[in-house]
UniProtKB/Swiss-Prot annotation:
GO terms for cellular component: cytosol. It comes from the Bacteria. Pfam families: Radical_SAM (PF04055), TRAM_2 (PF18693), UPF0004 (PF00919). Its cofactor is [4Fe-4S] cluster. Its main location: cytoplasm. It catalyses: L-aspartate(89)-[ribosomal protein uS12]-hydrogen + (sulfur carrier)-SH + AH2 + 2 S-adenosyl-L-methionine = 3-methylsulfanyl-L-aspartate(89)-[ribosomal protein uS12]-hydrogen + (sulfur carrier)-H + 5'-deoxyadenosine + L-methionine + A + S-adenosyl-L-homocysteine + 2 H(+). Catalyzes the methylthiolation of an aspartic acid residue of ribosomal protein uS12. This is Ribosomal protein uS12 methylthiotransferase RimO. SMART domains: Elp3 (SM00729). Binds 2 [4Fe-4S] clusters. One cluster is coordinated with 3 cysteines and an exchangeable S-adenosyl-L-methionine.
């Protein structure tokens, strides 16, 4: 499916206002890339450009690409091709931008190519090909203090660092985004406050490796509102927990100090939710991935986390069919799933990515075997997820409303992140509004979603 151009932010113009340059924008990939798109769009709006929703209305189109796996690269190339065909003036940025030669070879008409988080380069290229109007009046083109956001008004992503110090053999992110660079704690907290002041009810903390926040600067003590705060995940969570909104942690690598976050969840300071990518369970496969290989310790930690915080929701992702994965390894993973009883799980088959060290490993798993293992894996997890959601029937939960139509309201519980987890359906509740937090009793569940009745 071809991506839609995102209509990010529109302002009313006075009848006599000078004509603005008009930019179309396509944002592909993960929430980290979405935050990059928001930053670029914010600067373009500050410079007087309008963001428009169609190719025909745009003077130029920016495509923020994804390069995580080959399928994502192909989607990016297809999006670039569509933008060139429909508009003709295209600037490319994002993770696939590190493969500039391939992009230009496939699409010679591209005007400029830059890599991830190259904000100034992108804005500079837009200025070059569609110069900003000299009569730009910032009072006519007001940008909200929180900047341009591509998410609904009631939730937002908060990126705390860039890059990653790990060298997982299946991943090329460090080659695209570099080593870990943590944002100053004061800057992160200032942005969080702007979001809350703008009405955001849920902050989703993201990075390539959230639990490594501050490692690169030795957990330096920063300052926010006149008080010292360490550049460290626990200190960040404690500070965010004082803001009175939902705080959800994503991309948490299973370092030992993650244990220190669980009491904050039990106390209600941040949401009892961990997005923690385990990737596999077999020690042999994990070693080949260059991931932590202490599966028994991981299970024990999960048990302790749930003892401290019984409401804890654990989401994870896994790769099946990694080079060298035997049937014994895969069965080990299924047995581990049975013990771990994770709440939410995503999985995909291993796919060779250009530049990934895993490509050189022996024991490639046939595609047919990969697909069968994926189906078995997801069937197993569907049983687990269904049972865990069934256990919620009769319980009262908080629901953050995402959308309302003529059939009722759709929201999410504290156990559900946007886009990737389940929904809570409140049938016939047409008077609610997005961003509202309500209490409801769960009446029905399947393996993904809940149906509830408003109290």
């Amino acid at each position: 499916m071809a991506p839609d151009i995102l209509q990010a932010f529109m302002t009313e113009k006075t009848q006599n206002a000078p004509q603005s340059g008009k930019v179309g924008f396509i944002s592909l990939g993960c929430p980290k890339a979405l935050v990059d798109s928001e930053r670029i769009l914010t600067q373009l709006r500050l410079d007087g450009y309008d963001v428009v929703p169609t190719y025909d209305d745009a003077d130029i189109v920016v495509v923020n690409t994804c390069g995580f796996i080959d399928a994502a690269k192909q989607e990016s190339l297809d999006a670039i091709g569509e933008a060139i065909s429909e508009n003709g003036k295209v600037i490319v940025t994002g993770c696939m931008g590190v493969e500039a030669d391939r992009i230009r070879e496939t699409h010679p008409g591209v005007l400029a190519v830059s890599g991830p988080h190259a904000y100034e380069e992108v804005v500079g290229a837009v200025h070059q090909y569609v110069p900003p109007r000299k009569e730009h009046d910032p009072f006519l083109d007001l940008v909200p203090p929180q900047g341009v956001k591509l998410t609904p008004r009631h939730y937002a992503y908060l990126k705390i660092s860039e890059g990653c110090n790990h060298r997982c053999t299946f991943c090329i992110i460090p080659s695209m985004r570099g080593d870990l660079v943590s944002r100053p704690i004061g800057d992160v907290m200032d942005e969080a406050k702007r979001l809350v002041d703008a009405g955001v009810k849920e902050i989703l903390v993201i990075s390539q490796d959230t639990s490594a926040y501050g490692v690169d600067i030795k957990y330096r003590t920063g300052f926010w509102q006149g008080r010292p705060v360490k550049t460290k995940m626990q200190a960040l969570c404690e500070a965010l927990g004082e803001m009175g909104v939902w705080v959800r942690l994503h991309y948490v690598y299973p370092y030992p100090h993650v244990d220190d976050i669980i009491p904050l969840m039990a106390e209600g300071k941040i949401l009892p939710y961990l997005d923690i990518p385990f990737q596999h369970a077999s020690p042999r496969v994990l070693k080949a991935m260059k991931r932590p290989a202490h599966d028994s310790k991981t299970l024990e930690r999960i048990r302790k986390w749930r003892e401290i915080c019984p409401e804890l929701t654990i989401r994870s992702t896994f790769i099946v069919g990694f080079p060298g994965e035997t049937e014994e390894d895969f069965q080990y993973l299924l047995d581990w799933l049975d013990e771990a009883q994770l709440d939410r799980v995503g999985a995909f088959t291993y796919s060779a990515v250009e530049g990934a060290p895993a490509n050189e490993l022996e024991g490639a798993v046939p595609e047919e075997v990969k697909e069968k293992r994926l189906a078995r894996f997801m069937a197993k997890q569907a049983e687990i997820s269904a049972a865990r959601l069934q256990a919620k029937i009769g319980r009262t939960i908080d629901v953050l409303i995402d959308e309302v139509d003529e059939e009722g309201a759709i929201g999410r519980s504290k156990a559900d992140a946007p886009e990737i987890d389940g929904m809570v359906y409140l049938n016939d509740e047409t008077e609610l509004v997005p961003g509202q937090i309500v209490q409801a009793v769960v009446e029905h569940a399947d393996e993904h979603d809940l149906w509830a009745r408003l109290i």
